[in-house]
Amino acid sequence: MSSTANSAAHEHAEKTIEADAATGAAEDTSAQLGAERGATRFDIVLGKRGCELAAPVLRAVKCLITGAFLVMRKYSVVVYCATERGLVYVDLGWTIFDQYDFLPGGSDDPLLFSVATPQNGFLLDFLCDPPKKCAQDPVLSARFLVTDSDDPEEARELLKLIVTRESGTSTKIKRAAQTDERIYMPTANSACQVALEPYSHTEITKWLGALPKDAGVKVSISDTALGLERIGCAADSVSFNAQWMDRRADRVTSCDILAKLTGVGPDAGKRSLSARSALKKLKENRVVAVHSGSGWVHSELGWPESVRVRSAQSLKKALQWLKIGAWGVPNLVFYKDKVTGLGVELSGRGEEDLWGCILFFDSEEMDDLTAQEFQEPEDCAEADYGAVSESDDAAAETHRGADGIDGADEEDSCPDMMLISATTLTQQPGRKRAPGATLQQSAQPSSPATHRKQKRPAGAARTGAGDTEQNCVHDGEASLRAPCPASNDDQEPANKRGKR
């Protein structure tokens, strides 16, 4: 009997092993199929600290990024939006994320997702909430999980955004927006960067605010000065002494600038300048520090260089918005290109890996080029994306109002920002929106061709991220330009306008 029991037990054990092996094989096959059909491309987590860093920047430019793209790269996450005359971008580096992981050996091509989606807001609304709401129900973490589509007939990747607040968790799912548009992202390789101190930032914004709404501004940089003047009225201007630095430092300090000034040093009996004393002497000497961009030689830039911005108020708003937290006042960045650009950039002062820029293209150059047919630059061909239909996103777009801007009626919103011609963003159904520019890592800013409307090939599918165009409607056509003062006697006192 004992022999019979042992035989039965042995047989049962063999069947159990076979069953376990079959189950394990099935699990392995299922896991393999899941990996093949839904492999993880990105898995990154923005923690509470990262949200607190990014929120003020994105909140400041909320009305610009409502129709933007979220660009997932191997080195950062970028929020990007382009118009025909300029662009805005916010670059979130990996160092502000709590966790980041991406599929090794994957394609280096960036993945694009439309920010302007679901019915109850847009993709990044959790970073653009008012401070009061954030304090009442703070965001604890936001997980960006990008996987390959589990549909074998669907080639686009899926983004699952999981936002965890103290009150609970919400999830948004978005398909990649492969479009026929091109995206351009500027790099740190600019022609030069002007580090504005608080005194010059305040003086410039006050001067811009006193100009008529439809006034244009020419911003110029030379070997000796940074100047801003009203277009068509050279007597109405403000200028500062430009002090070129030998090297571009990661962090610009007042003492670095003062060390370059002849005869300026610490007070008697003191080893170094106090911050208060340094700023006072900077203001007395009307000095701003200018750093040559990497790869550029100061003597070979062909100064003076200038950029004509059509909307003084747009430039003023950009300077005000990007004066944020630990970064202090933003920098003015000149780009050297066929169409010279001027950027208001939040960078180089804070220690965190977060960059923001509102960039304006030279209006005079753009006007000269609008009547010409451009050939696409050769260096743009590598970043082409095929157009695919994204009807699910197009349907979701219909919920937005006529203004096409979330929060446009708020006090701090920006109806005229970013568009150099002082425009507002409106949506017109059935119209294609202006194409963006090319995503490239070169030192050269975009060419005008990347911001011109292009005819869609016959039979090509519409893009999902912007089937309805964000058209530019000039809100200052009927206003008359204020007359230029005939002499300096008619102008405001020099202490309000700055020394000429």
From Swiss-Prot:
Of the GO CC terms on this record, one is: host cell nucleus
Organism from which the protein derives: Psittacid herpesvirus 1 (isolate Amazon parrot/-/97-0001/1997) (PsHV-1)
Localization annotation: Host nucleus
Gene label: UL42
Q: What is its main location?
A: host cell
Q: What is this protein called?
A: DNA polymerase processivity factor
* Biased amino acid composition, Polar residues: 438-449
The segments labelled Disordered in the record are 388-500
Annotated GO MF terms: DNA binding
Q: Which GO terms describe its biological process?
A: DNA replication
According to the record's subunit comment, the protein's assembly and interactions are: Interacts with the DNA polymerase catalytic subunit UL30. Interacts with the origin-binding protein.
Function description = Plays an essential role in viral DNA replication by acting as the polymerase accessory subunit. Associates with the viral polymerase to increase its processivity and forms high-affinity direct interactions with DNA. Facilitates the origin-binding protein UL9 loading onto DNA thus increasing its ability to assemble into a functional complex capable of unwinding duplex DNA.
Family the UniProt entry places it in: Belongs to the herpesviridae DNA polymerase processivity factor family.
Q: Give TM regions.
A: none
Q: Which UniProt keywords apply?
A: DNA replication, DNA-binding, Host nucleus
